[in-house]
A protein has these predicted regions:
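Hydrophobic, amphipathic alpha-helical faces that serve as interaction scaffolds
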Residues: 50-66, 100-140
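Inward-facing hydrophobic residues that define packing positions of alpha-helical scaffold repeats
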Residues: 78, 119, 170-171
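Secondary-structure edge/capping motif, primarily at the C-terminal ends of alpha-helices
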Residues: 61-62, 81-89, 133, 158
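Short linear motifs at protein or domain termini
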Residues: 1-64, 114
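Amphipathic alpha-helical segments enriched in hydrophobic/aromatic residues interleaved with Lys/Arg
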Residues: 72-88, 94
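C-terminal all-alpha effector/ligand-binding and dimerization domain
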Residues: 131-180
Length: 180
């Protein structure tokens, strides 16, 4: 049915659904088809606990390997994030994508490919949740400015090559989200 609605063959649809299943975002239901997985509060909590364990490690290693060119790239990504977040009409998808680009640009510098893949999987599991609830988080001006300040604090720690500081900041901010 989906293939005919989209005007494509069944093969790309099957591949896309298999990919979603592999990432834990969808599940096959015998005699019914495929459906999206519903995350419980506990699922979200566990994902944030795992992110809190992994992301500060990747950021710490990134801080030890970061170049001036990397910092310049992050400044540009952050500037675009600020522009997007401060728009009158906020687009949750744009915010999510730019936020993801910022974080993964940091983690990629670590060269810890397996850890980065695990982090990416955790983000993928939360992507729909973050798009829905992330919009609510960014409704107020104060909340938006806090997110900008968080990103700026990471950038400042990276510029100073302060690996302990960036690790601490990320862990602290992720822990807050776990508690909420």
């Amino acid at each position: 049915e989906l293939a005919s609605q989209l005007g494509v063959s069944r093969m790309p649809i099957r591949e896309a659904l298999a990919n979603l299943e592999k990432k834990g975002l969808a599940e096959s239901v015998p005699y019914a088809g495929t459906r999206l997985v519903t995350l419980t509060k506990d699922d979200v909590r566990q994902i944030y606990i795992a992110r809190t364990a992994l992301e500060p490690v990747a950021a710490k290693y990134a801080c030890e390997k970061i170049t001036d060119e990397d910092i310049q790239n992050l400044k540009e990504i952050h500037a675009e994030y600020i522009r997007i977040v401060r728009q009158e009409e906020l687009d949750a998808i744009d915010v999510y994508q730019q936020n993801r680009l910022y974080h993964f640009s940091i983690y990629k510098i670590s060269q810890l490919d397996r850890i980065c893949a695990m982090i990416e999987s955790l983000w993928d599991n939360l992507s729909f949740f973050k798009l829905i609830y992330g919009q609510k988080l960014l409704e107020g001006r104060e909340s938006r400015e806090r997110m900008i300040e968080e990103h700026q604090s990471y950038l400042d720690a990276l510029k100073q090559r302060d690996s302990e500081r960036i690790s601490h900041l990320l862990a602290q901010n992720l822990k807050k989200r776990t508690e909420n």
